[in-house]
Amino acid sequence: MRLALIGATGMVGEVMQKVLVERQFPVTEFIPVASAKSVGNTLNWNGASHLIRSLDEALAMRPDLVLMSAGGTISLEWAPKFAAAGSFVVDNSSAWRMEPGIPLIVPEINAAVLSAETKIIANPNCSTIQLVMVLKPLHDLHPIEAVRVSTYQSVTGTGKAAVDQLENERRGIFDGPMAYAHPIDLNCIPHCDAFLDNGYTKEEMKLHHETKKILGDSRVQVSATAVRVPVQGGHSESVLITFQGARPSLPAVRQILAAMPGVVVQDDPANLSYPMPRNAEGRDEVFVGRIREDLVCDRSIHLWIVSDNLRKGAATNAVQIAEHLVSAGFLQTPLTPSH
């Protein structure tokens, strides 16, 4: 199939390139799309050189599938154009996530809602994906009343400029370009995305709204605090889950989570084994540990969740959505892949 990757030179786009090759996604024609300054250059992918195209050029080529990771403004304008031309669009921005009729997909949870008529598909927020991967199997067996989550988010979630700021500060360079309002090295910044009138940030409200939509249950209450930390390997989350009824036993929680595809239970504190972003980097699994009973409420448990935000939190989840479109027969598999 013809596949266009919009935002091919960004951090998520570069990881998408790797994931497509690693998972041997069937591509006959690869169409990288980037900003005007990159158009006309070449990009090496899967052993071949590919010309970087503009959005107009890519649209004229009528790709079967568009993986879009170029921000909400681009997505709002261009996703409908590609969809009207017959393309399936998997969008990594927040532009379409809460739109009625637009599916918000984590394939292990709700891929079944996709159809041949579903042309624009939203990829959830990175922090939301790893959270719902743990919540969903628990909620199915033991309905959840409320979730309180504090995130410890990698600078890679902001982009290359943030990684550059962190690396510059670690080298003692403090007069370079700033992706954040404050130094990030040796610091924690409780400010992910813009602040809203209710005192929460957009990132925190994404967790609030998206979790309910993916779980398909608006009764689940979610409150979040999102913090940027000087880490590159992935996002971490401290999560307090309160169940509607009696909480399941800790062995039952571990068993339920271990049976969830894509989730790895790493919960052996006695042997210093627990999830850490350093170990999650480059992996597609969601790691969960520090599973314990809350000491205040007898219906609550605590968890610690870690995942690579560029992979399962973005690129891998998008490619998994595309794989489902193929396996369901909505996208036709070519006989010979591109090289």
Task: Please report, for each region that a protein language model flagged, where it lies by residue.
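N-terminal Rossmann-like NAD(P) cofactor-binding subdomain of oxidoreductases
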Residues: 1-184, 219-221, 255, 268, ...
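Oxyanion-binding "anion nests"
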Residues: 187-232, 238
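Generic solvent-exposed, charged/amphipathic alpha-helical segments
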Residues: 17, 208-212, 254-258
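A glycine-rich, Thr/Ser-enriched phosphate-binding loop motif common to dinucleotide/cofactor-binding enzymes
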Residues: 120-130, 199-208, 313-317
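Glycine-rich beta-alpha junction loops
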Residues: 36-38, 126-127, 151-158, 188-195, ...
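A broad structural signal for alpha-helix termini and local helix breaks/kinks
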Residues: 142, 215-216, 243, 261
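C-terminal active-site/capping subdomain that shapes the small-molecule cofactor and substrate pocket
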Residues: 222-339
